[in-house]
Amino acid sequence: LITNYPITMLSRRDFLKLGALVTASAALASCAPVYRKILGDLTITAWASLNPRDFMMLNRITFGARVEERNRLAEIGLQNYIEEQLDFELIDDFSCDLQLSTFKTLDKDANELEAISNQLFDGYDRETVPNELRQATLIRQLYSKRQLYEVMVDFWSDHFNIFIEKGECFYLKTVDDSEVIRKHALGSFHDLV
């Protein structure tokens, strides 16, 4: 028994949705090699087994014991891991720096930031400067390989407690972060003050 089924036609809207889906899939597929280079191997790796003391220390000197930190600590030992983190300038942090490269206000001085914030219709507003600093801080805490350094930056920022929403601090906090806190986070207190 043969039944005749009506042939349904794709509406223009459904055709465009399908075309957009195919185009987006192709675009995402072409990005995979770039993301693989930035993020490394995306396969799930096993956690290294750590003794309770090492695990506690790792949690205190990082923003969370990620797989790569646990494996690195297990590989070289706690003392060597701390020494490596203290010499943070030698740690390759390319993927984090690449993510931060989209922020345009992080490397500007106070006069430039004030000018950016005061200009009308220039693509920036008063919230651009503090928002970029907040986003950059979170990215560094989550993705930087310089975890001890970022913990100390957070400690000193919290200690000196410059409220970013108060007065001129909305742009001066970015300068404080780059020129004072980040520059001296693992240095002497005298240089920091």
Predicted regions and their residues:
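C-terminal segment of N-terminal export signals and the immediately downstream linker at the start
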Residues: 3, 9, 30-60
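Short acidic alpha-helix initiation/capping motifs at coil-to-helix transition points
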Residues: 48-50, 60-64, 129-133, 169-173
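Short, functional "switch" segments adjacent to catalytic/cofactor/reactive centers
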Residues: 78-159
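Long, amphipathic alpha-helical surface segments
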Residues: 10-14, 32-44, 176-182, 186-193
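N-terminal secretory signal peptides and thylakoid transit peptides that target proteins
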Residues: 7-23
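Cell-wall polysaccharide-cleaving catalytic domain and substrate-binding groove, primarily
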Residues: 46, 50-93
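Hydrophobic h-region of N-terminal signal peptides that target proteins for export
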Residues: 25-29
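Primarily short, surface-exposed interaction patches in extracytoplasmic proteins
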Residues: 68-70, 132-193
